[in-house]
C-alpha cells in the first residue's frame, strides 16, 4: 500500500511546477503537461518516488544511522525542523556551513566548543569572570548554536542527505556527491535531478507540498526506528545481545581542584580572545 496518494498530493499543490521558460530538460520524464505556461508534475510518478524514498529511509533509520535534513528556504525551514525532530535526526535550516561534510572534523570541533562553553557555565567558572567577559563568551555560544545547534548530536558523517530544493542547496548536494553520501531530494521542474539518488518530483516552494511528502517519509522512518527497538528487545530477551567490543575504559584525570579551575579559566580566556579577534 502506498504511503501517500494522488489526491493528497493534488490537494497540497505538489503538482505545480515552474514556468516553462525556467524548466530543466532533465525533469522531462516527470512532467505531465503544460498549462498556462506552467509545467504540471505527474503525481502518479511522485507517488511511486515517495514510496521508493520512504522505504530506503526506513532501512537507514532501522540500521541506526543518521539522515541530515537540509532546507534553508523560508517556506520549508519550520516544517523541516519539526519533522526532523520528530524522528530525532539532525537538520540544517540556517545558512549551510561550507565544508559541513567535506571538512567535517572542523565542524565537529566547533560543536565541541559549544559543549565546552556549556561546561564552563555549569561548573562555576563564569563566577570568576567579569560581566564583559561573560557577555563575549555568551555571544560566541549563541552564534555557534544558531548555525550548528541542530547538528550537535551528529558525531559522524550522515548516511544520507534529505534536501528541499536541490537548486538552492547545490553546495550541500555537491559535498554529498563528492563523499558518496546518498541524496534524497524534493526536486521541482527548474532543478537538475542528475545528482540526486532518490528524486521526489514535486513543488518545493509550497509549505504544504513539502509537509505532506515529509509526513510520508518520516512515518516510514518512525517505523524503522520502532522495528530497531523491537529487535533489540527481542535480542536482549533471548540473551543474544552483542557484546560491546573494544569498549574503551574511561580514564579519570587526577587533578586537584585548583588545577581544574586553572584549566577552565584558560579555556574561558581563549574564548574571549577569539571573540575579540573576530
Curated annotation (Swiss-Prot):
InterPro entries: Ribosomal_uS2 (IPR001865), Ribosomal_uS2_bac/mit/plastid (IPR005706), Ribosomal_uS2_CS (IPR018130), Ribosomal_uS2_flav_dom_sf (IPR023591). Keywords: Ribonucleoprotein, Ribosomal protein. One of its GO terms (molecular function) is structural constituent of ribosome. Transmembrane segments: none annotated. Pfam families: Ribosomal_S2 (PF00318). This is Small ribosomal subunit protein uS2. GO terms for biological process: translation. The keyword Ribonucleoprotein applies. It comes from Bacteroides thetaiotaomicron (strain ATCC 29148 / DSM 2079 / JCM 5827 / CCUG 10774 / NCTC 10582 / VPI-5482 / E50). CDD domains: RPS2. The lineage of its organism: Bacteria, Pseudomonadati, Bacteroidota, Bacteroidia, Bacteroidales. Residues 233-257 are annotated as: Disordered. Belongs to the universal ribosomal protein uS2 family. NCBIfam families: rpsB_bact (TIGR01011). The keyword Ribonucleoprotein applies. Gene3D superfamilies: Glucose-6-phosphate isomerase like protein, domain 1 (3.40.50.10490), Helix hairpin bin (1.10.287.610). One of its GO terms (cellular component) is cytosolic small ribosomal subunit.
Amino acid at each position: 500500500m502506498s504511503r501517500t496518494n494522488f489526491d493528497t498530493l493534488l490537494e497540497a499543490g505538489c503538482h505545480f511546477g515552474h514556468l516553462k521558460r525556467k524548466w530543466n530538460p532533465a525533469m522531462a520524464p516527470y512532467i505531465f503537461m503544460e498549462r498556462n505556461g506552467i509545467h504540471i508534475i505527474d503525481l502518479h510518478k511522485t507517488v511511486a518516488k515517495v514510496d521508493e524514498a520512504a522505504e530506503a529511509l526506513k532501512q537507514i533509520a532501522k540500521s541506526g544511522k543518521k539522515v541530515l535534513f537540509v532546507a534553508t528556504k523560508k517556506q520549508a525551514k519550520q516544517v523541516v525542523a519539526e519533522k526532523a525532530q520528530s524522528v530525532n535526526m539532525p537538520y540544517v535550516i540556517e545558512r549551510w556551513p561550507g565544508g559541513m561534510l567535506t571538512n567535517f572534523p572542523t565542524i565537529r570541533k566547533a560543536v565541541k566548543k559549544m559543549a565546552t562553553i556549556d561546561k564552563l557555565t555549569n561548573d562555576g567558572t563564569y563566577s570568576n569572570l567579569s560581566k564583559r567577559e561573560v557577555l563575549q563568551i555568551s555571544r560566541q555560544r549563541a552564534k555557534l548554536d544558531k548555525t550548528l545547534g541542530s547538528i550537535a548530536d551528529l558525531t559522524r558523517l550522515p548516511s544520507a542527505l534529505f534536501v528541499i530544493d536541490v537548486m538552492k542547496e547545490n553546495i550541500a548536494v555537491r559535498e554529498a556527491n563528492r563523499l558518496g553520501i546518498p541524496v534524497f531530494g524534493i526536486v521541482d521542474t527548474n532543478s537538475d535531478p542528475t545528482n540526486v539518488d532518490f528524486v521526489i518530483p514535486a513543488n518545493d516552494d509550497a509549505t504544504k507540498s513539502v509537509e505532506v511528502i515529509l509526513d510520508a517519509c518520516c512515518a516510514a522512518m518512525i517505523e524503522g526506528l520502532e522495528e530497531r527497538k523491537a529487535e533489540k528487545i527481542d535480542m536482549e530477551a533471548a540473551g543474544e545481545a552483542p557484546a560491546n567490543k573494544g569498549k574503551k575504559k574511561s580514564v579519570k584525570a587526577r587533578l586537584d581542584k585548583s588545577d581544574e579551575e586553572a584549566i577552565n579559566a584558560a579555556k574561558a580566556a581563549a574564548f574571549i580572545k577569539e571573540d575579540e579577534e573576530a
